[in-house]
């Protein structure tokens, strides 16, 4: 995927409001692969919604979102699987870890889809993020901060 385009996109919850001032909503915007973007705004203005739309997790918006010119509303489940496997990853606010599994098992679930990162690389991230001693610890027995770091490692196991 080389571009993500938003064309007059607006969360449904904001529909009918005349006072929307945004660099994202109700604009034409193209995000290009390899470029860095900062999305910064006040609470309740749609930052998490934007991520959820682009990830295909939610579709309660007006307007059009395209990946490389293709409207994401037309994507099949198989398309989404391939996109999430090869092109896009998301670190959810809710983390979405399996509490009964260990830190390693949670990361390996994602990495097994791509086989992109070696066990050695993943162990290095655990070390770097200060959770190497939690490798075999069930998520339910970890602090929220430790769980966040496991979720970050899991999100990094992508081939892009």
Model feature map: region roles:
Residues 14, 108-120, 128:
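ABC-type ATPase nucleotide-binding domains, specifically the catalytic core motifs of the NBD
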Residues 55:
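Helix-to-loop junction immediately C-terminal to a conserved catalytic motif
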Residues 72-89:
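ABC ATPase NBD coupling module
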Residues 138-148:
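Conserved ABC ATPase signature
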């Amino acid at each position: 995927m080389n571009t993500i385009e938003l064309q007059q996109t607006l969360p449904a919850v904001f529909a009918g409001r005349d006072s929307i001032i945004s660099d994202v909503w109700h604009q034409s915007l193209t995000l290009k692969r390899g470029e860095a973007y900062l999305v910064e705004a006040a609470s309740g203005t749609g930052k998490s919604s934007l991520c959820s739309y682009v990830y295909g997790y939610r579709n309660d918006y007006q307007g059009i979102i395209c990946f490389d010119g293709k409207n994401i509303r037309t994507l099949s489940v198989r398309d989404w699987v391939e996109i999430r496997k090869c092109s896009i990853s998301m670190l959810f606010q809710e983390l979405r870890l399996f509490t009964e599994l260990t830190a390693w098992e949670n990361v390996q679930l994602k990495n097994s889809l791509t086989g992109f990162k070696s066990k050695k690389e993943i162990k290095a991230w655990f070390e770097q993020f200060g959770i190497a001693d939690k490798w075999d610890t069930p998520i339910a027995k970890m602090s929220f901060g430790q769980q966040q770091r496991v979720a970050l490692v899991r999100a990094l196991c992508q081939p892009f």
